[in-house]
């Protein structure tokens, strides 16, 4: 989740992101910065941009547009990370959680799109919240096990009993 937090800051606390995502989001900026990133899935595979009214301005998964809202995709607990990361205009914060999505378990991070440079203007009355997520696929969990030298690390059903385990719960 820490890598996702760090990546969120790279994609959201960025002068170019303010220019490209406020007002009407620039389609080419969205494609090159977010759609393409979800298509590779290296850093994140899902992204949503939400405006100050709670409307999704884009919804992306694996390089394609999602036909569902962020709230429907992540479920009721999603409101918690939006609230936790909500700050006054220009102030950066981030919150995260694990969610059961239609595509499986995902770690998601939410926070406002803000400038990196002091004094860089943010359009008055607007707010953009960027949400990025990475799904815990079997391949991804296997790679984590190899990276951290944890033999046989894998996802298991909730009723699977093992000597060593970590429970991921979506309240």
What are the roles of these predicted feature ranges?
Residues 56-57, 63, 107-109:
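Soluble extramembrane regions of membrane proteins in the secretory/endomembrane system
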